Amino acid sequence: MVLIQEVLEIVKKRNPNEPEFLQAVTEVLESIRPGIERNKKYRDAKILERLVEPERMIQFRVPWIDDNGQIQVNRGFRVQMNSALGPYKGGLRFHPTVCASIIKFLAFEQVFKNSLTGLPMGGGKGGSDFDPKGKSDREVMRFCQSFMTELFRHVGPHTDVAE
């Protein structure tokens, strides 16, 4: 269908360096193709275009002090993908490979996972490129405190429920 291809081209143009996100969007759009083709109202309401664009993306620095007294700086992310059904809901991932593309892809998939519960929850996801492996409990605590010092401004029970 032309619409699916048009939307995929827009997504690729806007997100050229986000392979994980592009793969997830491609797979989902291809899987819902029959429903979109049968229902003109979805096309007219630009459902696909709204589905693939996050409502909000937040990227921030996370400075923290390691056990040697050295300042470390990591990146933090929160993608608030869709709140059509309720507040954003989705967990946090701390792993050295975390980047905007991965968090965006996870937030995109979280929308569908949450919608299947029947509960009024939207979809979101957050995380950081912080690697907790090999870190002391105190280092993990200091990192998490710094991470939440920024993230708390963007989450809450009626807005975004970060797990």
Give short role names for the model-derived ranges.
Residues M1-E163:
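N-terminal ligand-binding/catalytic initiation module
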